[in-house]
Amino acid sequence: MDNPSSDPLPSTLSGEEEKPLALLPPVPRGRRGRPPGGATTSNRTLKSSLPRKRGRPPRSEQETPLTAPVDSGGSSDLLLIDDQGVPYTVPEGSAADGPQGSGSKRAPHFCPVCLRAFPYLSDLERHSISHSELKPHVCKDCGKTFKRSSHLRRHCNIHAGLRPFRCVLCPRRFREAGELAHHHRIHSGERPYQCPSCRVRFTEANTLRRHYKRKHPELVGMPVRLCPPNPRTQPLWDDDEGIPVQEGVQEESPEGKEPTWPISSTTSPLSGFTAGGSAGAGRGQEGQDTLVSGGIPTMEGDQKQGPKPLGPGAIGHPPVD
């Protein structure tokens, strides 16, 4: 047998060896031994052509959504799978509108009762309990059933006697944060419920509903909504009816006490002193006695008369000889 090593090389290789190798011109070195910018560009091109590390495909190969064309009567749709493994279809033009998981890409699930849309099927199943009589959450202490787990936790606080929410202004405690927020309106004076007819504000929604029945029967059944706070200074309110108290009206004084009057630095309502400070009665028109009280002259013939100055004959003493 012939030795395979003794076979002559192909003519192509022998021809290539006969050609002289072209020597590249020396590349000038830059400062600190770095080549000029042209060599750096070639190195970058070389790095991009090298194969990447194992387990890391190039970026062009990384496709985030798993897509597949779906034939839907002539219109091309895409079948996408979200991060939870739920498939959904979207039009082909809307696949590049936003990032994955956006509301425009995910096909909503509609409730057949109220036509409310949900992004996930699990949300729709949780919502469907509100339209049924199913109450899967049962209290272990009393056996009462609830539709939501949050309602069961709130009910369990009654058996445990827990009131974790405490008011910072008074020692009262509450089971829920909503009850504490409602209680804060008592301290702040906020009245977020306003009557649309007479513009009267109330603290509670039930008080506004009672106001509808008493004052505006045509508004009974109207939904009660929160209104924005009034930027103007709110007047005083009656606690029961919510009727604003008229300012400037004198309130009834308690029994046995004189009503309070505003006292200024120049006038006094106690006696008939003039603005100059002299006591006694002055002389008005037509010779009638007038009394200056608070800077306002009062005639004797009027219904409202001020206190008259006492003369020497008004004192009940025996006459002096």
UniProtKB/Swiss-Prot annotation:
Keywords (A to Z) from UniProt: DNA-binding, Metal-binding, Nucleus, Repeat, Transcription, Transcription regulation, Zinc, Zinc-finger
Gene3D superfamilies per the UniProt record, alphabetical: Classic Zinc Finger
Stretches annotated zinc finger (C2H2-type): 109-131, 137-159, 165-187, 193-216
Compositionally biased region (Gly residues): 274-285
PROSITE patterns referenced in this protein's UniProt entry, alphabetically: ZINC_FINGER_C2H2_1, ZINC_FINGER_C2H2_2
Compositional bias ranges of the Polar residues kind: 1-14, 39-48, 262-271
Region (Disordered): 1-80, 86-105, 248-321
S-adenosyl-L-methionine among keywords: no
Cell location: Nucleus
Main localization category: nucleus
A matching Pfam family: zf-C2H2
A GO cellular-component term linked to this record: nucleus
Any one GO molecular-function label of the UniProt entry: zinc ion binding
DNA-binding region: 49-59
Family: Belongs to the krueppel C2H2-type zinc-finger protein family.
Described function: May be involved in transcriptional regulation.
Protein's name in the database: Zinc finger protein 524
